[in-house]
Amino acid sequence: MRITAEIKPIPLGRPRLNTTNRGRYLPKSSIEFREKLQWILRSAYSGKPLENSLSVTLHFYKPTKITAKNYGDVDNLAKAVLDAANGILWLDDSQIIELHGYKHKGEGKIEIEVIEND
């Protein structure tokens, strides 16, 4: 399966500590990104979540120079997508046995390729 999400990729933010409630929370930008990406994924894929082991390739496109400082680490970019796809494309990201992530300069989008292994 191949899905192109026309959304500017952002890395998953680190959980913050709330001293008032003594809890942890994700930054607002991470939550908004996840919700938008989930809506895109649900629109693009209406099947049941895949149940077997998976190989996933992710291509991240941003219109900025490719550096960790202004682009984010590829593992944090991938984690944001993998978490958003839980329960939509697959049951849980623990099913992924092979993962490839690539950063490119270009218009803001994410290309997701999922291969179900037997």
Task: Give the ranges of each region predicted by the language model.
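Acidic, proline/glycine-enriched N-terminal capping motif
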Residues: 1-118
